[in-house]
């Protein structure tokens, strides 16, 4: 009897595969059940290997218990994408595989991979065939539809220019060629809107894939995609390696959005992984945005990406006018100046809608004692508690712990307790008391928790005449609110004073995106930006509305300072119950990095949120002139850490190309 040996990846936090044997040949990418200690785990065949040199009759190499499926989980391009991701992000390969396997297929049971038996036919619906394109849209479609192999394209389109229609036409062309399409969106709340547009355009089943669906529903979509029963899938970052049969096009909507970055567990960028996948599949990929990331614009400069522009709004509508409002000497009510409230009132009287943006949920972000200065903070995290009126609790936005509101200061027993600042709930309350007959619609993480909540809110917005929308970034992303003629931004200054390297990039994207919600059906729209820094050079440059000009200047500055995207960075993150353990581990790391050419390191530094869930958090900032240098150093560190007793006392991880230092 022949015995074959395999390296198998299992989902554990170790950067290695494990060798098992079996009496038959098994394809790479196949799911198998294997004994692991006292457990039985699902593993993925990574490679077939020769008989291990040290093998003897007393060998402890265990046997594979069972082949779970007759089909592989991942075909070669997706399999190779996972190998690349594990290598690039320096993350345990078993956990990377596990990230992209549906939950139901991670279980040891009788579920196997096979077709559902429900094929869809795709045609353009008659009602949608007469849609008239703008000349900009026609030009973009003509250029993009010519691309048939790997060649990343940036579709730059100002807000309201009709990028979604371009996506639809490109998808139609792809379907006519007998191929399938994957569309990635940054957030779950954007999937219903885009899903509706595709459903209105095409007959046939449109696949939807995101984390709020049941695991069974996600598995069904995954299987239908794998066996060619659906040819269009719209999903969030978890769908980036959706195994669509004969995929011919990947579209990334709002490519700049940081929600494409997973910040917990396996830290990866779905945008960058999608680009790698399209390279391995040798298919075109389109990245759409009104505010492209500096990383993407750098690649355009270097001729690695092609830029296609849509410079005018649909129907020739003018972009809204951005106005800064100096609030240094203005009393604020719920975070709003009197001039802001007057502008809201004038807009409502005309029968139009207003969008009020404040990137902070809850009622008040600070609960303070007037007697001794005590501030309510989380016992497990280094963060202030936020009062949520809807729950009558003080909430930690880091670990979501809830605390009762005390009537006496726990430090000095004073009853002189006050709430300061404003969140979405407080703004909502002030507006409800000011505009009694006007619907106030709050859109934040708390108001959209229930399944279908966002769809109901969007429906209410579209069915209302005069209304005031109050919300966080959820409102700023990709939504079409044609009745909004005034947008108000309450806390833009946070981006001007942030220590983050990419703070101004984030701020410019946010301001342009929020302003883009206004004036989609009206030439007289405006945006009010409340600020204590009305003369700030960067703010006034952003206010001009010329994002590409601002981004180009930012790239020039970053190039001179050797900041990303002109250098490669990694945060070595570290957490433990004691600051001393972090310090010993990271200082030892700094010492060995000091001898590495092409790499510099700063630290150890406390994270901006220095304590979370009972653990102290620190990091080392590692910067390299080239990605190859960085990758080489990180591989070296992994080997070293495995030898160190200090690494066993902390939880460490690499965050490559990080989007923040929180």
Residue ranges and their predicted role:
Residues 440-441, 597-607, 648-656:
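Short beta-strand elements
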Residues 58-61, 372-374, 611-623, 656-662:
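Short, low-order "capping/linker" segments at domain edges
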């Amino acid at each position: 009897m022949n015995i074959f040996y395999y390296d198998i990846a299992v989902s554990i936090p170790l950067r290695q595969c494990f060798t098992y044997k079996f009496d038959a040949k098994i394809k790479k990418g196949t799911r198998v059940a294997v004994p692991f200690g006292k457990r039985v785990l699902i593993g993925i065949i990574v490679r077939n290997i020769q008989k291990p040199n040290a093998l003897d009759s007393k060998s402890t190499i265990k046997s594979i218990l069972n082949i779970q499926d007759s089909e592989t989980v991942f075909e070669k391009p997706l399999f190779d994408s996972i190998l690349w991701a594990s290598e690039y992000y320096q993350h345990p390969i078993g956990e990377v595989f596990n990230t992209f396997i549906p939950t139901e297929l991670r279980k040891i049971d009788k579920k196997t991979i096979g077709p559902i038996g429900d094929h869809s036919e795709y045609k353009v619906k008659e009602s949608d065939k007469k849609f008239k394109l703008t000349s900009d849209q026609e030009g973009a479609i003509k250029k993009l539809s010519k691309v048939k192999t790997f060649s990343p394209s940036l579709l730059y389109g100002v807000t309201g220019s009709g990028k979604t229609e371009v996506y639809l036409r490109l998808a139609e062309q792809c379907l006519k060629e007998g191929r399938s399409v994957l569309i990635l969106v940054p957030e779950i709340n954007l999937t219903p809107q885009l899903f509706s547009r595709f459903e209105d355009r095409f007959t046939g089943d449109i696949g939807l894939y995101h984390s709020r669906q049941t695991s069974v529903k996600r598995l069904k979509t995954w299987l239908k995609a794998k066996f060619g029963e659906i040819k269009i899938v719209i999903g969030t970052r978890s769908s980036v390696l959706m195994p669509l049969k004969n995929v011919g096009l990947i579209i990334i909507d709002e490519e700049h959005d940081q929600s494409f970055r997973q910040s917990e567990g396996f830290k990866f960028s779905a945008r960058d992984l999608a680009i790698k996948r399209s390279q391995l599949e040798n298919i075109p990929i389109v990245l759409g945005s009104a505010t492209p990331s500096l990383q993407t614009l750098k690649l355009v400069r270097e001729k690695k990406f092609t830029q296609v522009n849509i410079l005018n709004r649909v129907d020739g509508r003018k972009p809204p006018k951005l106005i800064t409002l100096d609030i240094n000497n203005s009393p604020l009510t719920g975070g709003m100046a009197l001039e802001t409230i007057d502008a809201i009132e004038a807009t409502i009287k005309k029968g139009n809608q207003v969008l009020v943006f404040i990137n902070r949920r809850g009622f008040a972000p600070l609960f303070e004692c007037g007697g001794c200065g005590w501030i309510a903070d989380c016992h497990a995290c280094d963060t202030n508690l936020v009062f949520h009126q809807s729950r009558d609790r003080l909430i930690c936005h880091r670990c979501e712990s809830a605390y009762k509101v005390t009537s006496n200061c726990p430090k000095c027993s004073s009853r002189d307790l006050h709430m300061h600042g404003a969140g979405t709930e407080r703004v909502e309350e002030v507006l409800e008391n000011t505009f009694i007959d006007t619907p106030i619609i709050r859109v934040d993480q708390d108001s959209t928790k229930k399944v279908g909540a966002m769809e109901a809110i969007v429906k209410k917005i579209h069915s209302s005449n005069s209304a005031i929308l109050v919300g966080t970034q959820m409102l700023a992303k990709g939504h079409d609110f044609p009745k909004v003629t005034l947008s108000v931004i309450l806390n833009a200054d946070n981006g001007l004073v942030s220590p983050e390297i990419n703070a101004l990039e984030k701020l410019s994207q946010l301001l342009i995106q929020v302003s883009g919600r206004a004036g989609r059906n009206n030439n007289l729209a405006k945006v009010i930006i409340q600020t204590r820094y009305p003369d700030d050079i960067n703010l006034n440059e952003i206010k001009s509305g010329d994002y590409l000009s601002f981004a180009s200047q930012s790239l020039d500055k970053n190039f001179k300072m050797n900041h990303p995207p002109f250098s490669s960075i990694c945060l070595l993150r570290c957490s433990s119950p004691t600051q001393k353990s972090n310090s010993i581990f990271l200082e030892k790391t700094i010492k060995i990095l000091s001898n590495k050419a092409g790499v510099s390191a700063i630290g150890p530094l406390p994270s901006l949120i220095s304590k979370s869930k009972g653990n102290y958090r620190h990091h080392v900032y590692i910067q390299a002139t080239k990605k190859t240098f960085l990758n080489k150093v990180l591989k070296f560190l992994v080997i070293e850490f495995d030898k160190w007793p200090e690494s066993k006392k902390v939880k460490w991880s690499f965050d490559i190309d990080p989007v923040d230092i929180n």
